[in-house]
Amino acid sequence: RLETSGMIDRLIAEDIRILTVPPFNDLGKEGMQIKDIQIEDLLQRYPIHVDIRKISSHIEGKRIMITGAAGSIGREMVRQIAGLNPYKLILVDQAESPLHNVQLELLDNWRDIDAKMLVADVTNQTRMESIFKDYRPQYVFHAAAYKHVPMMEDNVSEAIQVNVLGTRIID
C-alpha cells in the first residue's frame, strides 16, 4: 500500500515525474516495467468514472459552498470545482491556516475565481444560518467531518457533534 501523507501532492506541485516499479518477482515479465503512477496505484481500486460535462452543467455559473474546504477531501473538491467555472466559491472551514493555504492555491491556479473564505464551525447553527442567508449557495458540498474512525471511537461525543449534528445544521 502506498502511504502518501501528502508526499504525492508535493511531488506533483513541484512538477516531479512519479514512477512505480512492479514487484521484484514480476520484473522482466512481459508488460511489467517501470511506469508512470496512475490513480489506481494510489487508491488501490478502480477509479470511478464520471460524466464531467454533466457535472459541469450544474456547477458553471453557480454559487457553490464547500464545507470542510481545507481538509483533504474538501480541498480536492475545491480543486475539481474551481476548474468547472463556478460563479462563486463559498469555502467554509474551522481551520484558519489550512483555509488560508487553500486561498493561496486558488490565487496561484484560478486567479479569476470569486472565492470567499469563511472561518466557521458547521456546528454553530447561528453562524451557518447567517452564511446561508448572506451567500445563498445553490449547491453545497458538505465535507466537514471527522474521518478517522478508530480515533473517533474514543471521542464519540465530538464525532456525533460534528458528523451528525453538523450535517443536520447544513441540511
State each model region's role:
Residues 2-19, 88-95, 134-135, 139, ...:
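NAD(P)-cofactor binding segment of oxidoreductase domains
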Residues 4-63, 70:
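Flexible, Lys/Arg-rich cytosolic regulatory linkers and terminal tails that connect or flank
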Residues 14-16, 110-115:
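A short helix-to-beta-strand connector/capping loop
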Residues 64-84:
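N-terminal Rossmann NAD(P)H-binding glycine-rich loop of SDR-like oxidoreductase domains
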Residues 93-98, 122:
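Helix N-cap at the beta1-alpha1 junction of Rossmann-like dinucleotide-binding domains, i.e.
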Residues 102-112:
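Short, conserved SAM-binding/catalytic segment
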Residues 116-139:
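Conserved Rossmann-fold cofactor-binding substructure of NAD(P)-dependent oxidoreductases
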Residues 143-147:
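Conserved NAD(P)H cofactor-binding loop of Rossmann-fold oxidoreductase domains
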